[in-house]
């Protein structure tokens, strides 16, 4: 036996319309809409030997100006990396700049590797996804930063870097 629940409107406790339907299968929502989106992709090839956090490449930066101080941003990126030496790891963090005030780490501590290879000549993909609520209407810029435990990690390895930044409206 199948059951159906037919409604044309879903409201919250304040009687605000959250989801409406026109009866023909088309729904609209007053919440959780994508306001803006920007993306980039390019061939990345960055050899990193730094044991301090550094920006992978300035071309990795993505910026949007929020429509509201209540907007949420979702940043995601992925890129290949190559480790030529055994027992080499790296840390991956997301840095943010608001209105040109300078970059700061918003993604947390450095207690875990984002990638680690115990043998030589390993190639893999690194991914990062982060949700942020910057509480501003000034331009917000995001960029991934990395540091290695030892040796050299090639970020990109002449492969594609992909990133997307989305504004989710309140």
Regions found by a protein language model. Name each.
Residues 1, 6-8, 54-55, 121:
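Mixed-charge, polar/low-complexity N-terminal
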Residues 2-48, 170:
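Glycine-rich, low-complexity segments
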Residues 40-55, 63-139, 143-170:
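Terminal beta-strand-rich extracellular "head" domains
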